[in-house]
Amino acid sequence: VTTRIGINGFGRIGRNYFRAALAQGADLEIVAVNDLTSPEALAHLLKYDSVGGRLTETVEVKDGNIVVNGNIIKVLAERDPANLPWGELGVDIVIESTGFFTKAAAAQKHIDAGAKKVLISAPASDEDITIVMGVNHELYDPAAHNIISNASCTTNCLGPLAKVINDEFGIERGLMTTVHAYTADQNLQDGPHNDLRRARAAAINMVPTSTGAAKAIGLVLPELKGKLDGYAIRVPVPTGSATDLTVTVGRETTVEEVNAALKKAADSDAFQGILTYTDAPIVSSDIVGDPASSIFDSGLTKVIGNQVKVVSWYDNEWGYSNRLVDLTELVASKLG
């Protein structure tokens, strides 16, 4: 039986999730999307994408719903998740990608409205579990976990990197900088914002700002709790980011040894499609549209004694959305 999916919030991640499910040929039926705008606008933004290009599938609006390749997707415009007809529509799993309902109590409204599970496409609070595919997904327990966070795009990039280095060398402490594409949470032109750096024009500045990614690593790798911190510098690209991690490890090592450990991990079954390895001298454009969570750049590794610096690229929209599809399939495979 195909698992029925509802998407709450059809923005960058909601739409990329839809495209990723199509691209993967996932055994998931997206039956409804909820967003506070017109079906025409949602259909147009699904079909035409400034980063991902034009969708080859036919996309139309009929009777207020979106029709993709003949499949009808019901369009809802409900502000309060409690009022969504998930039960009536037979929705099994809700993708919560509005960015607003990241607290468990708010996400619970989807379950009260008839859904079985909620996957939050962001760091959450009071969630049953935070999962990074390839790092701690085997801890998923369908009996205990109903509200699940897929963490952030940056935690999905950092997680595999930190796991491999910690398993191989032991991380004592470390600091991370992510050089990150701008997002809709920044201003296009200078204007008020509660973060006075994000207040500034996104497309013409390097914007230092917070990221919870390093601290959140303790949620998926408890042995690293309190050992990592960092921040982001948002830069003028629409997608395509890089995580730069510098750690003190438990013993002296070399560039060759660090790269060999990451190559071995990237080639292993455990990290297939999640952690990949490149020795090509790439730039951010080269990884746009890459579905991996973490694209390790071996040419950038630096080592001095027991101090190690590594860099992994990620398409913060597409890679993350593909992991959200993978997580949905994991949860779907264990539905009662």
Q: Where do the PLM segments sit?
A:
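Short, solvent-exposed beta-strand edge segments and adjacent coil->beta transition regions
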Residues: 144-145, 201-203, 240-244, 307-309
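C-terminal active-site/capping subdomain that shapes the small-molecule cofactor and substrate pocket
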Residues: 230, 242, 246-336
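Generic secondary-structure signature for well-ordered alpha-helical cores
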Residues: 22-26, 163-171, 181-184, 211, ...
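Short clusters of hydrophobic/aromatic residues that line enzyme substrate/ligand-binding pockets
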Residues: 66, 131-133, 147, 188-189, ...
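Generic structural signal for well-ordered, non-membrane alpha-helical segments
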Residues: 10, 14, 103, 151-154, ...
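Acidic, glycine-rich segments within the central catalytic cores of soluble metabolic enzymes
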Residues: 167, 171-238
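Alpha-helical scaffold segments in soluble metabolic enzymes
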Residues: 12, 16, 20, 44, ...
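N-terminal Rossmann-like NAD(P) cofactor-binding subdomain of oxidoreductases
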Residues: 1-199, 302, 326, 334-335
